[in-house]
C-alpha cells in the first residue's frame, strides 16, 4: 500500500495526471487499501488528474459497489478499455 501510494505521489509530482491501477493480480483489498485509493484519488483530482481502475474480479467489483466507491472511480473490465477513453 505505502509503496503504491509513494509511487503514485512521485509521478504526480513529476507532472503525470493520468493513472491506471490494474487489479488483474489482486484478489483482495482491505479497508486500509481502500483508504489509500480514496486518498490517492483525492490528491490526483486536486491536481487536475484522474485515477482509473481496471480488471477487478467479481468480489472486488462487489466490494466497490457495496462501499459506493464505484461512483468515485471509473472502473473498466480491461486495461485497454480504460486507456481508450483517457
Regions found by a protein language model. Give the residues of each.
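Short acidic-hydrophobic, aromatic-tinged amphipathic segments that line or gate anion-handling sites
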Residues: 74-78
Amino acid at each position: 500500500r505505502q509503496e503504491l501510494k509513494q509511487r503514485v505521489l512521485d509521478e504526480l509530482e513529476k507532472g503525470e495526471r493520468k493513472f491506471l491501477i490494474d487489479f488483474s493480480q489482486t484478489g483482495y483489498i482491505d479497508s486500509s487499501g481502500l483508504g489509500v485509493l480514496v486518498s490517492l484519488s483525492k490528491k490526483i483530482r486536486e491536481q487536475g488528474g484522474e485515477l482509473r481502475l481496471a480488471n477487478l474480479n467479481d468480489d472486488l467489483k462487489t466490494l466497490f459497489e457495496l462501499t459506493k466507491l464505484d461512483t468515485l472511480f471509473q472502473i473498466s473490465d480491461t486495461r485497454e478499455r480504460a486507456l481508450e477513453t483517457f
